[in-house]
């Protein structure tokens, strides 16, 4: 099983798809990596030679921030926005949408589950 950036790639998938299991590598970046390393994109991970695996591993670590480093960078960027008190930082802290979306309705993903507020009870007649 090939390991790239601390992630075990699934053995039965094509290398092009398997690379997307690494945080920070999507399909277009995986295709770019394969083109630059000269590995056949139709190769399955189980059929990958040690030489090819080493080529992929070194190319990814030298050219991209992936996995833990990328997660740390993202969280530090958000922390910086919060610390300097920007509007975006306040929205992150409040758990609301950051990029100008409406919040009167929708925004459920960012705000979490609905909290039902009991309405006024009708007086019995």
UniProtKB/Swiss-Prot annotation:
Location of region: Disordered: 96-125
GO cellular component labels: cytosol; small ribosomal subunit
Source organism, top-level taxon: Bacteria
Record's keyword terms, sorted: Ribonucleoprotein, Ribosomal protein, RNA-binding, rRNA-binding, tRNA-binding
Pfam families named in the record: Ribosomal_S13 (PF00416)
GO molecular function: rRNA binding; structural constituent of ribosome; tRNA binding
InterPro entries: Rbsml_uS13_C (IPR027437), Ribosomal_uS13 (IPR001892), Ribosomal_uS13-like_H2TH (IPR010979), Ribosomal_uS13_bac-type (IPR019980), Ribosomal_uS13_CS (IPR018269)
Compositionally skewed regions (Basic residues) per UniProt: 101-125
PANTHER family for this protein: 30S RIBOSOMAL PROTEIN S13/40S RIBOSOMAL PROTEIN S18, SMALL RIBOSOMAL SUBUNIT PROTEIN US13M
Membership in a protein family: Belongs to the universal ribosomal protein uS13 family.
NCBIfam families: uS13_bact
Purpose: Located at the top of the head of the 30S subunit, it contacts several helices of the 16S rRNA. In the 70S ribosome it contacts the 23S rRNA (bridge B1a) and protein L5 of the 50S subunit (bridge B1b), connecting the 2 subunits; these bridges are implicated in subunit movement. Contacts the tRNAs in the A and P-sites.
Binding partners and assembly: Part of the 30S ribosomal subunit. Forms a loose heterodimer with protein S19. Forms two bridges to the 50S subunit in the 70S ribosome.
Protein name, as recorded: Small ribosomal subunit protein uS13
Lineage: Bacteria, Bacillati, Cyanobacteriota, Cyanophyceae, Oscillatoriophycideae
């Amino acid at each position: 099983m090939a390991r790239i950036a601390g992630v075990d790639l699934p053995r039965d998938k094509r290398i092009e798809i398997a690379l997307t299991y690494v945080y920070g590598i999507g399909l277009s970046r995986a295709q770019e990596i394969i083109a630059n390393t000269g590995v056949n994109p139709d190769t399955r991970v189980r059929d990958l030679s040690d030489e090819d695996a080493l080529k992929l591993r070194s190319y990814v670590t030298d050219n991209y921030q992936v996995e833990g480093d990328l997660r740390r960078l993202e969280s530090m960027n958000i922390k910086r926005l919060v610390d300097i008190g920007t509007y975006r930082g306040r929205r992150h802290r409040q758990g609301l949408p950051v990029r100008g979306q409406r919040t009167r309705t929708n925004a459920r993903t960012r705000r979490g589950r609905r909290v039902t507020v009991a309405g006024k009870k009708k007086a019995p007649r």
